[in-house]
Amino acid sequence: MPVVVVMGAQWGDEGKGKFVDLLAERAQVVVRSTGGSNAGHTVWAGGRQYKLHQVPSGILYPGTLCVIGHGVVLDPPKLLEEMDRLASQGVDLSSLRISGGAHIVFPFHIRLDEAEEDRKGDRKIGTTRRGIGPAYMDKFARVGIRLVDMLDRDEFLPKLTALVEEKNRILEKVYGLPGFTVEEIAEPYLEYAERLRPYVANTVELVNDAIDAGKNVLFEGAQGHLLDIDFGTYPYVTASHPIAAGAIIGAGVGPTKVSRVVGVVKAYTSRVGEGPFPTELHGEEAHRIREEGHEYGTTTGRPRRIGWLDLVMVRYACRVSGITDLAVPHLDTLAKTGLPTLKVCVGYRMPDGTVTREFPVGLKALSQVEPVYEELPNWEWSAEMSTARQYDELPEGARRYVRLIEDVTGVRVSILGVGSERTQAIYRSAIF
């Protein structure tokens, strides 16, 4: 039963888009089932760059069924803008299907997100200010509006009226900001709904039918494990579940149907936004990695925080999500930095002097750990590295780096990335 979940095993931005794109070539169905427009994938194909936020990466393969599931919060104008951009690049969108059960992000969600981040000042979470958290709040408060509601004017308008009245009270009385009229939201969003209507389908049936028929089904995770609302560095997290279990919950698929879970682990660590970061680097080392790795947010454009690879974090992700295979991109980036020595965190030294590989639950405990590093010599960059397609063609230094990852996590590294193009990858084990 070839059902594969691809998820980020760090703080997002690991390079999932490349590996989803690679695996999508062998998939008949690609599913995006968590998060919203706050997540971003950049895929290179044929020398052309495609930036994806809400549309599954499989859309670049004609005929591949691409599904946006229940668990996603949709930003309709952003989604339609993305669809129009892809269409202008020659991408066929006829295979896209969207769940009517997906909740909607409205302008008042975005304004509330911005207002709360501004109010917190130095204590801000570092959200993308896309309204994702407030939209999920409405979902779990059972007052949210779903795409299926927007398709029925008589169903939509009373729900929107009640929600606008509630949000206006908060915006005006708590934040001193102007609210919205029902009319300024209703008419454009009803138009968005009509544009999306041809793509709406019963995605639970579509995905489960495909699985039952033995088709290759790929679940495309958004963000990363350490941003999970339950298992991440709370409260510096997203409002959904980027772990493997979240991918199948958001699509309406049972856990027994998953055959492989691929965790994507960047060869170093990056983070956007606030929160603890035990292996964070500053100065020249961080600058070199950031520039060689083009570490600027797909969604925000913000420079990402950079640090050494943290295998305590990755081991934690492997345990929580039952990761069966690791995919490691950016081996080429480390070589290109020219840094003579690389560090890998293999444990945390606690304040009492003990060393552990357990990831702490509390922020205070995490902020007090001292990374225990293993130092390895960097490998020299050469053009041959990006043309390597066999593991033994890699420099010995890179292979030693991979072995250390496997030793600490206990999980095989099955795919390696040696460049930004989709073809620049090494398979050590077939996923599909």
Swiss-Prot record:
User: Could you say which residues bind substrate here?
Assistant: 298-304
Residues the record lists as binding Mg(2+): 13, 40
Q: Which GO terms describe its biological process?
A: 'de novo' AMP biosynthetic process; IMP metabolic process
Cite the EC number.
Answer: 6.3.4.4
Catalytic activity field: IMP + L-aspartate + GTP = N(6)-(1,2-dicarboxyethyl)-AMP + GDP + phosphate + 2 H(+)
**Which cofactors does this gene product need?**
Mg(2+)
> Which pathway does the database say it acts in?
Purine metabolism; AMP biosynthesis via de novo pathway; AMP from IMP: step 1/2
- Cellular component GO terms held in the UniProt record: cytoplasm
Which residues are GTP-binding? 12-18, 40-42, 304, 330-332, 417-419
EC top class, as a word: ligase
Q: How is the cofactor bound?
A: Binds 1 Mg(2+) ion per subunit.
Q: Which PROSITE patterns match?
A: ADENYLOSUCCIN_SYN_1, ADENYLOSUCCIN_SYN_2
Q: Which UniProt keywords apply?
A: Cytoplasm, GTP-binding, Ligase, Magnesium, Metal-binding, Nucleotide-binding, Purine biosynthesis
Q: Active-site residues? A: 13, 41
Family assignment? Belongs to the adenylosuccinate synthetase family.
Record protein name field: Adenylosuccinate synthetase
Q: Which organism is it from?
A: Symbiobacterium thermophilum (strain DSM 24528 / JCM 14929 / IAM 14863 / T)
